[in-house]
C-alpha cells in the first residue's frame, strides 16, 4: 500500500474521478479505489472509529456523493490519517478546510501490471507522459504545463 507515499490522489467529489484515475493507471473500470481520511471524521463517513492507518479494514460508505471510492458492495477500504502522518496529514487537513471533504481518493502511483514508481527519473517521465496535473516530490512541486 502506498498510504500517501508514492500515491495518486484526487478529489473524490469530482464526478468522474474514478474514470480519470483509471485512464492514468490504464486499468479496468471495475476495480475499486481506497481513500485516506482524517481520523477524526472516519465514523461520520465509514460508521466506525477503529484506527486504520494501514488500510486493513473496510467501512460502509455513509455519504452518497462518493461514488469514486465506494465499492459495489457499498464499502470502502480506507486509511485513517492523523498528526503522526506529518505532511500528508497537513495536506489532507488543508484539503478539508478548502473543500469541506476530509478525504481523498488514494491509490498507488503505478500503471496496471507495473510496480510502484521507485525513483525520481521514472516518476518525472511518467508525470510528463500522463494527464496528471501536479507532481510533488519531496518539497518540489511540479505543475503540468499542458493543463
Task: Identify the meaning behind each predicted range.
Residues 1-147:
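Flexible beta->alpha loop and helix N-cap segments adjacent to enzyme active/binding sites
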Amino acid at each position: 500500500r502506498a498510504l500517501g507515499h508514492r500515491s495518486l490522489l484526487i478529489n473524490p467529489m469530482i464526478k468522474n474521478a474514478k474514470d480519470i484515475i483509471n485512464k492514468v493507471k490504464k486499468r479496468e473500470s471495475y476495480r475499486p479505489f481506497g481513500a485516506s481520511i482524517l481520523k477524526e471524521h472516519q465514523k461520520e463517513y465509514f460508521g466506525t472509529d477503529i484506527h486504520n492507518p494501514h488500510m486493513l479494514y473496510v467501512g460502509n460508505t455513509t455519504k452518497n456523493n462518493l461514488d469514486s471510492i465506494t465499492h459495489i458492495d457499498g464499502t470502502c477500504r480506507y486509511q485513517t490519517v492523523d498528526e503522526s502522518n506529518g505532511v500528508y496529514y497537513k495536506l489532507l487537513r488543508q484539503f478539508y478546510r478548502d473543500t469541506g471533504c476530509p478525504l481523498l481518493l488514494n491509490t498507488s502511483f503505478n500503471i496496471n501490471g507495473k510496480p510502484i514508481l521507485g525513483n525520481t527519473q521514472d516518476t518525472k517521465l511518467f508525470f510528463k507522459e500522463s494527464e496528471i496535473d501536479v507532481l510533488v516530490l519531496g518539497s518540489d512541486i511540479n505543475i503540468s504545463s499542458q493543463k
